[in-house]
């Protein structure tokens, strides 16, 4: 249960060891690491570094020339475009990971899994209300992290953002 880094690697290892593997994930393969944490934050860092390199180019002896005339660039940060790019990169990596799992023989279920005893899982596929009960010799729970909300500082999506909301803000 869970398709983040831990669940992803466990599923691949299980198949390589000859097991029949079902991976249940409701938000996308790669989990928060790929979709809302590592990939997006590294993309933001790389974008900020690129803007800084352009801004400091003249101090390093690099001059920008347009139509034979030196120009001093104005750095303009387009946050909606940056967010769209980083979300696209995250979705692309998630899709690649899904394709890898499927190519290796993992059955991926888009849905929610709940333990039902020692050797059973109730699977509710996304968009459905009924559950299917499956039996498993081994169950790995790798459900990852969730943003912690403090009673005194609940995220409202405007003034207080959690790390999942951050990448969907506009201007």
Regions found by a protein language model. Name each.
Residues 8:
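Residues forming the Rossmann-fold NAD(P)(H) cofactor-binding site
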Residues 12-19, 24-170:
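Glycine-rich flavin
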């Amino acid at each position: 249960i869970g398709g983040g880094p831990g669940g992803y690697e466990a599923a691949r290892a299980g198949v390589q060891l000859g097991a029949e593997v079902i991976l249940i994930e409701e938000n996308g393969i790669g989990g928060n690491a790929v979709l809302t944490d590592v990939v997006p934050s590294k993309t933001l860092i790389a974008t900020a570094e690129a803007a800084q390199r352009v801004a400091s180019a003249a101090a390093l002896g690099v001059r920008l020339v347009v139509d034979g005339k030196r120009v001093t660039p104005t750095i303009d940060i387009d946050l909606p475009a940056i967010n769209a790019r980083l979300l696209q990169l995250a979705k692309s990596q998630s899709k690649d990971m899904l394709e890898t799992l499927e190519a290796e023989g993992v059955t991926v279920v888009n849905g929610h899994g709940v333990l039902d005893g020692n050797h059973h899982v109730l699977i509710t596929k996304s968009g459905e209300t009924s559950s299917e009960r499956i039996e498993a010799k081994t169950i790995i729970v790798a459900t990852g992290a969730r943003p912690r909300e403090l009673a005194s500082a609940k995220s409202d999506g405007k003034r207080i953002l959690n790390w999942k909301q951050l990448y969907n803000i506009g201007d």
